[in-house]
From Swiss-Prot:
Enzyme class: isomerase
GO molecular function, one term: ribosome binding
Alphabetically ordered keywords of this record: Cell cycle, Cell division, Chaperone, Cytoplasm, Isomerase, Rotamase
Name of the protein this chain belongs to: Trigger factor
Pfam families: FKBP_C, Trigger_C, Trigger_N
EC numbers, comma separated: 5.2.1.8
Originating organism: Rhodospirillum centenum (strain ATCC 51521 / SW)
Residue intervals of the PPIase FKBP-type domain: 163-248
Amino acid sequence: MQITETSADGLRREFKVTVPADEIETRVANRLSEIGKTIKIPGFRPGKVPMALLKQRYGQSVMGEVLEQAVNDGSAKAVEEHKLRPALQPKVEVTKFEAGSDLEFSMAVELLPDFEPADMAAIAVEKPVVEVADAMVDDGLKRIAANRKTSAPLEAERPAQSGDIVVIDFDGSVDGEKRPGMKGEDHELELGSGSFIPGFEDQLVGAAKGEHRTVTVTFPENYHAAELSGKEAVFEVDVKDIRVPKAAEIDEDFAKSFGFDDLAGMRDAIRERMQADYASMSRMRAKRQLLDRLAETHDFPVPTGMVDIEFDQIWRRLQQELKDGEADPEDKEKDEEGLKAEYRAIAERRVRLGLLLSEVGRRNNITVTRDELGQAVVAEAQRYPGQERQVFDFFRNNPQAVEGLRAPIFEDKVVDFILGQVKLTERTVSVEDLMRDPEEDEGPTAAA
């Protein structure tokens, strides 16, 4: 087998591979002999079938099999001999072959770039943090109590107003026809909550206890029941009672109703939950800033094929969002050429950062353990309460799905490793500042 490098351009390499005719013939003969040992043909004992008959019956399929294997072997040998690090599967094209002649094929391959990661200790990252104050815990308790609210009778009769709870019977129709789910009795509705069709609650403001009202509304265009989208509906409504909402009392009994020993224990749990949530958001902001700094300090070439794959995924997602009306309003105003240029730059950034994180992980022996993969599977199952068994079964029967969890775990471990190397400073901010999109302050930044 002869391997000749024919082109070297950036990360792209091209080779010409020649497999001698006698090697092809030997491979074919060996494969036919293997078949002859097991194949059953009437009139012949296994292993005694004439080679001529084997060639007649199986020669064509065996030749195809041998050529495919020869190409695979030749490609692998080219990679090994030239110490290549392919970024993607090499592209192979058979350029010459006739029965009894040499096999010639070309192989084009893009390589992973060789580069030196920057000195991480020279990179500065600011991490926004939130201190959970007692007042924040108080607000959290009040929100929980509001969700546990009851209602109390009016001290004096008056018309319903926003914020009141009205007890109603209602019966709706569309185009004069009754529809399922449009009738209810003794339903408690908080006016102004937005829990009913837009406009419904507004038309009950000012109603008195015992009053009957006809309410006309229009279902939103994006209503979940497509047959009702954009339709006008008429509801006959009887206001049976008007009550005022009453938040639950925040006391020891309130805490015990949630399974806590006392109110202090509930406050501690709320504080810990807040601290965990804000710590997660804080890490996300630090990670984003780190990736921005890494993108600024690294500009090595990246394989075009990898960028093409990443761009295609982004572009398909964008096209679906545009179709569903969920795309960024700014994207809707841009021409296709401008959008493609913008998102190709994002694709290139993502590929470069991915290669950088992979190299940092490789150099520092960062790996993903079986236990970490198992914990990730458990976390996925917890996202689907009541369906945990089905989730576990899915991952058990689909090992490739488990492997799909490896990349994000690896990325997080490498990011945490780098954050431990950089000059990391913390800055105390408000909850509003922590939640604010950094692009609002820093201008557009291509997401990693």
